[in-house]
Amino acid sequence: MGFLKILRKQRAREREMRILILGLDNAGKTTLMKKFLDEPTDTIEPTLGFDIKTVHFKDFQLNLWDVGGQKSLRSYWKNYFESTDALIWVVDSSDRERLTQCSEELKKLLQEERLSGASLLVLANKSDLPGAIDVNSIAQVLELQSIKTHHWKIFSCCALSGERLVQAMTWLCDDVGSRIFILD
């Protein structure tokens, strides 16, 4: 039995995923994580550094790493890449002025060797706000169709209501699970 098969069998028993949540500041990363964990979202502070939460979802243990998105913290993102199974990239779909910056940061991340093979879930958050950019336009600006190095999918969502969050996380778990675990 090859080494890779042994590793896959070990991970199959653990059924654990490491998920990194990144995006520009004020995109809604922490609110999305708290909503998914069914925690209160009425008092959210900017994440200075990182926060780790663990939740069981779809027979998996998800270790969610919420990392601050302020410009001064982005150079530290690379410290969290190791052993990442999936990347959730959160976009503020109401922030037209920073969409190009958002695209540039995502492109840098996708070039990182330690993130190679990680599934990419793009969450176009704040889709409920007036003037929010539609998901197809966001996909176009982010040039998602050109991504060949990662499995990816984009969902519009609303962190405050939780709209489409379970659907998005289900896709992510199914995608990662089909690649790195021996499914029953």
UniProtKB/Swiss-Prot annotation:
GO terms for cellular component: centrosome; cytoplasm; microtubule cytoskeleton; plasma membrane. One of its GO terms (molecular function) is GTP binding. Pfam families: Arf. The keyword Membrane applies. GO terms for biological process: cell division; cortical microtubule organization; embryo development ending in birth or egg hatching; female genitalia development; protein folding. The keyword Ligase does not apply. SMART domains: ARF, RAB, SAR. Gene3D superfamilies: P-loop containing nucleotide triphosphate hydrolases (3.40.50.300). Its main location: cytoplasm. Coiled coil: none annotated. A lipid is attached at G2 (N-myristoyl glycine). It is found in: Cytoplasm; Cell membrane; Cytoplasm, Cytoskeleton, Microtubule organizing center, Centrosome. InterPro entries: Arl2, ARL2/3, P-loop_NTPase, Small_GTP-bd, Small_GTPase_ARF/SAR. Keywords: Cell cycle, Cell division, Cell membrane, Cytoplasm, Cytoskeleton, Developmental protein, GTP-binding, Lipoprotein, Membrane, Myristate, Nucleotide-binding. GTP binds at residues 23-30, 66-70, 125-128. CDD domains: Arl2 (cd04154). PROSITE patterns: ARF. Belongs to the small GTPase superfamily. Arf family. GTP-binding protein that functions in embryogenesis, cytokinesis, germline development and microtubulule cytoskeleton dynamics. This is ADP-ribosylation factor-like protein 2. It comes from Caenorhabditis briggsae. The lineage of its organism: Eukaryota, Metazoa, Ecdysozoa, Nematoda, Chromadorea. The gene is evl-20.1.
